[in-house]
Curated annotation (Swiss-Prot):
Gene (name only): COG6
Provenance organism: Vanderwaltozyma polyspora (strain ATCC 22028 / DSM 70294 / BCRC 21397 / CBS 2163 / NBRC 10782 / NRRL Y-8283 / UCD 57-17)
Homology family: Belongs to the COG6 family.
Subcellular location: Golgi apparatus membrane
This protein's name: Conserved oligomeric Golgi complex subunit 6
SMART domains named among the record's database cross-references: COG6 (SM01087)
Membrane listed as a keyword: yes
GO biological process terms held by the UniProt record: cytoplasm to vacuole targeting by the Cvt pathway; intra-Golgi vesicle-mediated transport
GO cellular component, one term: Golgi membrane
Presence of keyword Transcription regulation: no
Keywords assigned: Golgi apparatus, Membrane, Protein transport, Transport
Length: 825
């Protein structure tokens, strides 16, 4: 923009023409208005401005004349700008008629005079500035919209920043010499800033100019050489191609070959070497995405280097491969140290720090996992890191587990063993182990689960390593870490099982062990791990201890002897033993019965044989036989033995039968035990039945004849009179003589049959604890006796039809009478 300056009106030209002095005029001192005499107004009209300078001590006449002319011109222009009446041509420079006050005192009031002059000066200044601004704005160079907008922005910027730029508006618009200096100062400052900006721009071109100057001599040489070559070629022109151009073509071809070689070498350098920045990143940088990109580049270099080994001269490939391996070794060592730092920070950090590190929003886990993926390329470092992880975490987990048994720690809540509740103690131990497994599983899976890792732009070899070494790594580490708890857990639980004699408690322990085995496996513990194997071994020990509880009880019973009582009740120990068994069966039923796989593991067919069958067969029956040593010789002792055995089996069946559908499966081997008990009971009942039949037949005298007839043809098979013909041969037997029959049968039959029912019920049936069995034996015996008596009577009448009356006298009870006497309807 143009600066508004009064000196533009010829002052500078006049000064420049002065002899040998180009300096700007200096401002004069302010006139002392009070020193003037205003009594004679006419005197002031004739003031010569040049005389003022004489009074100030100015002696140079030529200089005063020039200054006087300048001031006259200045005053003239100012008066024209203020529209003062009168023409400027007739106005004398030496007179100021309009501005000299009158001689009276009122007109000489300094304040009014200054105020009036100030208003007039401000008005004159505004008019001059308006003209200047109008001239600038109407300039053709600012007629377009862009220039106008730029000018408007510049003016607005000056207006807004006048305080920051220390612009004094009053000074800049002052028409006096102070305003002139202020505007010149502003102009100088603006020009200085413009010069600085121009210098800044030029400084940017300095390197370019310097390079161009360096090439200037070479360019001149090339130009000169080209000119000489063209001149030489014209002078030596012939009908064939010029030799000079042949050389040029040859040189150009060489240049193209060199360029191609250069491009090839640069491409090889870019593909097979690392930059200095990348090498510095390996040595001093942190592990981040940039380092992973460098690793990918090194791996790609290694993959490409393999092809160089197939060249005729593999030395370059071997050298490059050696260098790449060294770089990979440095990278793997860096990744190894980085992973160890994270591991140690996690071990020594607080829970809040660890949770923040494991947060999905944090990149620490992703960096850790990706570092481990790349580290898997070096199995030595990879396996060493896994060993460090396993050892550190195993120690931490074991310390946390043992702290639960520390009674001296103030912060610990120790697990205490109660003499009355060992099951709770074992449960607390297993619950503590489970919580440690759960926490460790969360930690391991958050760091070592690589299923969702993004592997873009990753070399194929790295991805193959991931699939080979990293899949299932979290489960592998978890099992190796938790392995440290297996022996400690086994020792503490084994101490409880070793001294536990309650079969129900042992059963509950087995159930508890199986439950936590299942829970551990669901958390990722493998079924073949040492912890699961130890729990299985403890379960086997507890099962053996369960069987041992019953075996010890039976072994103590074997040392005693059975003493028969008058009522032939089972031994007292049998009831106690059955109570122990039924308590176990009730616990079995409460825990789900056959629907529980754990129950099926505990209550097996082998267990039932050892706990039920073997004690009955080897202890109970043996003890009962020893209690009746004459049972083989005497029917009465044998009857007592059978009675006790029937009562024992009836007691066993009554206690076990309610659990038949729960424990003794119908299609399994467990049912064999229950079937054996039933068969054994039926066997004893049948033996008792046969014995009672024999006694009954002997007491009635029909025993010998019963055997005789059944030897020829079974009595039970006789259906009609034709079957009686089978017994005709008996007529030749002397025992079948009616007199012999009368002697052997008649008296006994008449004496015992009326009291047979009462005798059997009184001496036998009342001693059997089961009325059903007693009725069964009684009914079967008398039914057999009645059937034989009727058949025997018919047989005699069939053989000796002429002796019917005698036969009726010997066997004097009719069929109805006999049945009535023996209680058969």
């Amino acid at each position: 923009m143009e600066f508004i300056d009064y000196d533009t009106f010829g002052v500078s030209d006049t000064i420049s023409t002065s002899a040998g002095d180009g300096a700007l005029p200096e401002p004069v001192a302010i006139l002392n208005l009070n020193a003037l005499s205003f009594e004679k107004p006419d005197e002031h009209n004739e003031i010569n401005l040049s005389e003022l300078l004489v009074d100030r001590g100015t002696t140079d006449g030529g200089k005063n004349v020039n200054l006087n002319a300048k001031m006259s011109n200045y005053a003239k222009l100012s008066m024209e700008s203020l529209h003062i009446s009168g023409t400027s041509d007739n106005l004398s420079v030496n007179t100021l008629p309009s501005y000299i006050p009158d001689g009276n005192k009122e007109s000489l009031d300094i304040s009014k005079l200054v105020f009036q002059q100030k208003n007039q000066s401000l008005e004159a200044t505004n008019m001059i500035l308006n003209k200047k601004l109008s001239k600038i704005l109407n300039d053709y160079s600012f007629s377009n919209y862009q220039s106008t907008s730029y000018l408007r922005k510049s003016l607005n910027s000056l207006e807004e920043n006048k305080v920051a730029l220390s612009l004094d508006e009053n000074k800049l618009t002052n028409p006096g010499y102070i305003g002139t200096l202020a505007r010149k100062t502003l102009k100088s400052d603006v020009e200085t800033e413009l010069l600085k900006e121009h210098l800044t721009v030029l400084e940017e071109f300095r390197p370019i100019v310097r390079k161009i100057k360096k090439l200037s001599s070479s360019i001149e040489n090339i130009q000169n050489l080209g000119t000489s070559m063209l001149k030489e070629s014209k002078e030596n022109a012939t009908g064939t191609e010029e030799p000079m151009f042949d050389r040029i073509k040859s040189l150009r071809k060489d240049i193209d070959n060199l360029k191609l070689k250069k491009e090839l070498l640069l491409s090889i350098r870019d593909q097979y070497t690392l930059t200095q920045v990348e090498d510095d990143k390996i040595s001093n940088g942190s592990v981040d995405e940039e380092l992973f990109e460098i690793i990918n580049k090194v791996m790609r270099i290694k993959e490409k280097t393999v092809f160089m080994l197939g060249l005729e001269n593999p030395n370059a490939g071997k050298s490059l491969m050696h260098e790449v391996n060294n770089i990979l070794q440095r990278l793997n060592r860096k990744l190894f140290n980085h992973l160890l730092d994270i591991l140690y920070i996690f071990e020594s950090g607080t829970n809040n720090v660890n949770e923040k590190f494991l947060s999905p929003n944090e990149k620490g886990v992703q960096t850790f996992q990706r570092s481990l993926i790349y580290l898997s390329n070096d199995l030595e470092y990879f396996n060493e890191f896994l060993k460090r992880v396993t050892s550190l975490r195993s120690k931490t987990v074991l310390d946390q587990f043992l702290s639960q048994f520390d009674f001296n720690s103030k912060d610990a809540n120790p697990i205490m063993l109660s003499a009355y509740d060992p099951l709770r103690y074992i449960g607390d131990i297993l619950a503590n182990v489970y919580s440690l497994i759960a926490n460790e599983a969360d930690f391991v899976r958050s760091l070592f689960n690589f299923q969702e890792m993004q592997m873009e732009n990753t070399p194929v070899s790295i991805i193959q390593k991931k699939d080979e070494f990293l899949d299932g790594l979290d489960s592998k580490l978890l099992n190796e870490i938790i392995q440290s708890l297996s022996n400690t857990c086994r020792i503490r639980i084994g101490q409880i099982i070793k001294f536990e004699d309650n079969p129900i408690t042992n059963f509950e322990i087995v159930k508890l062990l199986e439950l936590y085995k299942m829970m551990f496996e669901r958390k990722g513990i493998k079924s073949n791990s040492s912890l699961i194997n130890n729990l299985s071994a403890l379960g086997v020990v507890s099962q053996e201890k369960l069987i041992e509880c019953y075996s010890n009880f039976v072994n103590e019973i074997e040392k005693t002897t059975y003493v028969a009582t008058e009522d032939f009740l089972p031994p007292e120990w049998l009831s106690d033993y059955l109570v122990k068994i039924t308590d176990l069966f009730e616990a079995y039923e409460q825990h789900g019965g056959r629907e529980s796989d754990t129950n099926e593991i505990i209550i097996t067919d082998t267990f039932l044989e050892k706990v039920i069958k073997e004690p009955i067969e080897n202890t109970l029956l043996k003890q009962l036989k020893e209690g009746f040593p004459l049972a083989k010789k005497e029917e009465q002792a044998r009857t007592s033995l059978y009675t006790v055995q029937i009562n024992c089996f009836d007691l066993i069946k009554s206690r076990i039968q309610p659990f038949a559908s729960v424990i003794f499966s119908k299609d399994g081997e467990k049912n064999d035990v229950l079937k054996w008990i039933s068969d054994k009971s039926e066997e004893v009942i049948n033996q008792m039945l046969e014995l009672q039949k024999k006694i009954l037949f002997d007491k009635t005298g029909l025993g010998m004849y019963n055997n005789l007839l059944n030897m020829i043809f079974p009595i039970s098979s006789v259906k009609d009179d034709l079957d009686l013909d089978m017994y005709y041969s008996l007529s030749e037997n002397s025992l079948m003589n009616l007199d012999s029959i009368n002697t052997n049968v008649h008296e006994k039959l008449n004496d015992y049959v009326p009291i047979a029912l009462t005798d059997m019920q009184g001496n036998l049936l009342f001693k059997l604890t089961s009325p059903v069995i007693a009725d069964k034996i009684c009914d079967s015996c008398f039914s057999t006796l009645s059937e034989f008596y009727i058949t025997f009577r018919k047989t005699l009448m069939h053989i000796y039809p002429e002796e019917e009356i005698k036969i009726k006298e010997i066997l004097n009870f009719s069929e109805e009478e006999f049945k009535t006497l023996v209680g058969i309807e």
